[in-house]
Design a protein with these regions (language model features):
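NAD(P)H-binding glycine-rich loop region in Rossmannoid oxidoreductase-like domains
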Residues: 53-97, 105, 120-127
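Conserved glycine-rich Rossmann-like NAD(P)H-binding loop of the short-chain dehydrogenase/reductase
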Residues: 30-40
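N-terminal Rossmann NAD(P)H-binding glycine-rich loop of SDR-like oxidoreductase domains
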Residues: 8-28
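SDR active-site strand-loop-helix element
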Residues: 11, 36, 76-80, 114-120, ...
Length: 314
């Protein structure tokens, strides 16, 4: 049985899922949380919000001092991920090389509970840098011989969302016109990160059996309706304007020439229109957690008095 003072290590824990998970772990009384991440500004935000959490800079793609934190750890939640960008080697370093080193140190210290976070894109028809390296990552985890539940979430949103819906909401509040690619009727299965963190905690506390779990949002929502929901929740005044897909693609391509880490890439646009539909399992029943309705989750995301206004660096 996990004790509240047992060490929980979160590699890559200064991002969307990690910041939310820390908040919820602390709310449940856990006191020995270690976050390892290479995003310095987001580590600073975590230290400011959660001053009693040990948050250290670490490049997980290279061996280093960070590996000592796995000694005596009872739980490791593998959160590190390269999601966006145009440099393939960045995806390899953060999604593949870092995973290899973490698995090695988990084995070396015989950590009893590992919860790796994969992605629904592993089962996608898309073929991009993120999808390829997440497939490699998941294969490496399954071949490691470490029994663990592998979680495959769909597109997530919630507190601390610096990319995805969080970035879209901030962009929407800065511009008079918000462009929508094509007709905008691209089905999504958005997953509230608060629900996903409760699933992770269930894995930790209930020792969920090893296997692959597709964690999809239970509500199918078109991209344009997600944007409308964000506009309503934030009170943004931007006019939503549908523009031809090819023009939208060209503008993103042009943006990528001047920004080495653009918020939205042509590869991500192609994935948006791929029309993937992911398996929906009974994760509320299987993990013993509640599902937050999409409309309520959007409201909590942008209007929570404690975390709704905290913005991570992109």
């Amino acid at each position: 049985m996990l004790m509240l003072n047992n060490k929980i290590v979160l590699p890559g824990g200064a991002g969307l899922v990690g910041q939310n998970l820390v908040a919820r772990l602390k709310a449940r009384g856990y006191t020995n949380i270690v976050v390892l991440d290479k995003h310095r500004s987001n580590l600073d935000i975590l230290r400011r919000i959660q001053p009693d959490v040990l948050a250290e800079y670490a490049d997980l793609s290279a061996s280093g001092e960070w590996q000592r934190h796995f000694a005596d750890a009872k739980v490791v939640v593998m959160l590190q991920a390269q999601i966006g960008g145009n440099d393939y080697q960045e995806f390899v370093r953060n999604n593949v090389n870092a995973t290899r080193l973490i698995l090695e140190v988990v084995k070396a210290h015989a950590v009893p509970c590992l919860v790796p976070i994969s992605s629904s894109v592993v089962a996608s028809v898309a073929d991009d840098f993120y999808t390829r390296t997440k497939r490699d990552q998941e294969r490496m985890i399954l071949d490691s011989g470490i029994p663990c539940p592998v979680l495959r979430p769909t597109l997530m949103f919630g507190w601390f969302d610096r990319k995805h819906l969080g970035w879209l909401s901030r962009f929407m509040q800065k511009v008079p016109v918000f462009p929508i690619p094509g007709h905008g009727r691209y089905m999504r299965q958005p997953l509230y990160v608060g629900d996903f963190c409760n699933i992770i905690i269930s894995c930790i506390e209930n020792r969920i059996p090893a296997g692959i779990y597709n964690i999809s949002g239970h509500e199918k929502v078109d991209y344009i309706d997600i944007i409308r929901a964000i506009k309503k929740a934030t009170g943004a005044r931007a006019v939503l304007l549908n523009i031809p897909y090819r023009l939208f693609y060209g503008l993103l391509w042009l943006w990528g020439l001047f920004d080495k880490n653009p918020p939205f890439t042509t590869q991500q646009l192609s994935a948006l229109i791929a029309n993937d539909e992911f398996e929906v399992i009974d994760w509320p029943g299987g993990f013993g957690v509640s599902q937050t309705p999409f409309a309520k989750a959007i409201d909590e995301t942008f209007n929570d008095p404690t975390y709704g206004r905290v913005v991570l660096e992109f």
